[in-house]
Amino acid sequence: MSRPRCSRCQRPSSLCLCALIPALDSRTQVLVLQHSSEASHALNTARLAALGLCNAELRVGERFEDDCDAARLSYLLFPGEDAIPLGSLADAAQPVRLIVPDGTWRKARKILHVNPWLAELPRVALPEGLSSRYRLRKAPMPGVLSTIEAIVTALNLLESPSRFDELLRPFDALIEGQIDAMGREVYQRNHADT
């Protein structure tokens, strides 16, 4: 029998993170396109980001409809040779819409592949050399962040340094809860060098 879950954060009721999730407003609209395989993942950071941002939406699936609004410039937050530095949009006269694919790198690339309209959007990238707080996963390459970390970094660059850091509180608690559940000794043995 499965444990009762919080209907909002989807965590087991005894590990509910809702008290830590802020309600932050942003000028930037965030649309997270989450691969369906991530939706039930225990460490689902995209859901935390969407819950903590008043101007965010989370869509789950693999194929998504193009509903880009001409009144709001849309950008794809995803690295690539043609990606422009995200910070260059900080002084944009009109609000922007940031579209963020969520999943493993392989699944995120698949989202881009099966949704050709995403490839038509201008890409923006985070600065190089960032380090992740995600101590439970080994990054496939240096400078890789979880979805929530990428969104917080992006919003801090676009709007105001450190204004969105509060969104990382439930993420930090999520990581600590997982470490406590596995035991500190197991964590040290398997993840201490990540």
Where are these regions (language model features)?
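Immediate flanking context of iron-sulfur cluster ligation sites
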Residues: 1-3
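Short cysteine-rich clusters marking metal-coordination/redox-active sites
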Residues: 6-9
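Cys/His-rich microdomains that often coordinate metals
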Residues: 13-16
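Iron-sulfur (Fe-S) cluster-binding segments and ferredoxin-like electron-carrier domains
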Residues: 20-26
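Extended interfacial segments that mediate partner engagement and assembly in macromolecular machines
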Residues: 28-65
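Cofactor-binding loop segments of dinucleotide-utilizing enzymes, especially the Rossmann-like FAD-
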Residues: 35, 79, 128
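S-adenosyl-L-methionine/SAH cofactor-binding core of RNA-modifying enzymes
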Residues: 50-113, 117
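C-terminal folded domains that constitute the principal catalytic or ligand-binding module
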Residues: 97, 106, 114-194
